[in-house]
Amino acid sequence: NATVSGLPAGVTYTFAGGIITIFGTPTVFGTFPYVILPVGPCLVPVPPVGGTITVDNDATIALTSAVGTDNQTKCINTLIINIDYLVAGGGTGATIAWVPSVPTGIVFTPLGGNNFRISGTPTVSGTFNYTISTTGPCIKPTATGSLTVTPDATVTLRAGDDANPIVCINNAIPSIRYDLGGTFTNATVSGLPAGVTYTFAGGIITISGTPTVFGTFPYVILPVGPCLVPVPP
C-alpha cells in the first residue's frame, strides 16, 4: 500500500495498480509539502519522495475610505474626498478604467502595500464611471464607482434684449430675458424699481413691468444652486 500526507484540504489521492494519483480542488491557500510513504516489509525511500503544492489565494478589493466616497457628486473645480481601496488576498496590484474618460484633474495613485487612491480636483463636468480591476494569478474581482461633476451656474442675456433700458416713468420697459445654465434650482432678482418684477420658468428669467418711480436701479440676478454663481453676478 502507500499513503500520502500533507495535502491541502480538498485534495486527495488514490492508490491502485501500483500507481498513486493525487487530485482534487484545494479549498485553502498556502504552501503544502506532501510526502508519499510506501507501506511494505522493506525500507522506504530516504529521503522520502514527495513534492509541494502551492495554492494561490483569490484577490480581494475593499473600499477603505468612508462609506459612500466611491460615489460622489461634486461641483466643478472642487476637491473630491479621497477614494481609497485595499487589494488583498492573492492580489498583486490594480488598474483603473474610466467611462467615458478620466475626468481632467483626477488621478489614480498607488500608495504602497497594495493601497490605491483616487483623488484630485475635477476641472470638467459630467458623469464619470470607473472600474478598478485587480491583478493576480487567480480570481480577480473588480470595484466600481462614479464621480458626478456638476457645472457652476451661468447667466446669459438673451440675444437682442437690452439689459439696461431707459424708459419714462409709468411706461412699460421692454422685457429683459436671461437664460440660466449649469447647475441651479432657482433664481432671484434684486434691485428692481417699484412696478417692475420678474418671473422664473424653464431656466429663463424674464424682467418686465412699468416703473412707477424714477431713478437708476442696478439689479442683480442671483442663481440658487449647489455650485458657484457667476462673479460678478
Language-model regions, residue ranges each:
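Extracellular/luminal low-complexity segments enriched in Ser/Thr/Pro
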Residues: 21-29, 117-125, 205-214
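C-terminal edge beta-strand
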Residues: 44-59, 139-151, 229-233
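Low-complexity "stalk/linker" and mucin-like segments enriched in Ser/Thr/Pro/Ala/Gly
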Residues: 3-19, 95-116, 188-205
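A short beta-strand micro-motif common to beta-rich folds, especially ectodomain repeats
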Residues: 30-42, 85, 126-137, 215-227
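Short, solvent-exposed loop/linker segments at the N-terminal edge
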Residues: 71-79, 164-172
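A short beta-strand segment in extracellular, disulfide-stabilized domains
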Residues: 78-87, 172-180
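Proline-enriched interdomain boundary motifs that mark the N-terminal boundary
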Residues: 58-69, 152-161
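Extracellular acidic loop/turn motifs
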Residues: 1-2, 88-95, 180-188
